[in-house]
């Protein structure tokens, strides 16, 4: 690769890995924010929608799904706050960002699906913010290392053995 086409301050794969570590942390925060957004969109939808002459938010299963969504978002927030504390303390490693990215993206994916469910058919309409959150969840789940790759990074830290070939 000619010198003119090289990224500045990137001299080895270790430099690339450091960039990915930092980006995974950012993605974990993004996933957490979108997770709260999906929950809030669903909560707002059920607050103004009626079904069978009753507020949609009064149905037991809708309330259970809202509770599940808020729990997912809150757990994600705890994970990224801890990640930030690790960064600030200088004890931040690849597996920390991989774990946060993997966990928050999975919680987002689940929360977006639940939000879509409580909105029924309106949850798949493109003008509905729930549909946008659902699409964002799929993208976030995949970029800056797929769920599987990040799981292997975590597994390597747990076992001391790399599954990468």
Q: Each predicted region: which residue ranges?
A:
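Glycine-rich beta->alpha junctions and the first turn(s) of the following alpha-helix
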Residues: 1-74, 139-140, 156, 165
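Generic, well-ordered alpha-helical scaffold segments in large soluble proteins
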Residues: 41, 45, 86, 114, ...
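Amphipathic alpha-helical coiled-coil segments
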Residues: 107-115
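Glycine-rich phosphate/cofactor-binding loops in nucleotide/flavin-utilizing enzymes
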Residues: 119-165
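C-terminal helix-coil-helix/basic helical segment that borders enzyme active sites and/or dimer interfaces
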Residues: 47, 51-54, 70-103, 116-124
């Amino acid at each position: 690769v000619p010198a003119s086409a090289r990224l500045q301050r990137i001299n080895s794969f270790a430099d690339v890995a450091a960039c990915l570590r930092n980006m995974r942390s950012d993605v974990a925060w993004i996933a957490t924010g979108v997770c709260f957004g999906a929950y809030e969109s669903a909560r707002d939808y059920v607050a103004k929608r009626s079904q069978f002459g009753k507020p949609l938010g009064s149905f037991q299963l809708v309330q259970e799904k809202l509770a599940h969504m808020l729990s997912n978002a809150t757990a994600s927030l705890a994970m990224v706050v801890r990640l930030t504390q690790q960064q600030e303390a200088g004890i931040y490693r690849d597996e920390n960002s991989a774990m946060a990215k993997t966990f928050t993206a999975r919680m987002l994916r689940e929360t977006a699906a639940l939000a879509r469910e409580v909105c029924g058919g309106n949850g798949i309409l493109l003008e509905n913010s729930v549909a946008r959150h659902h699409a964002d969840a799929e993208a976030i789940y995949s970029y800056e290392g797929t769920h599987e790759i990040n799981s292997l990074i975590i597994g390597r830290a747990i076992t001391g053995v790399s599954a990468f070939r």
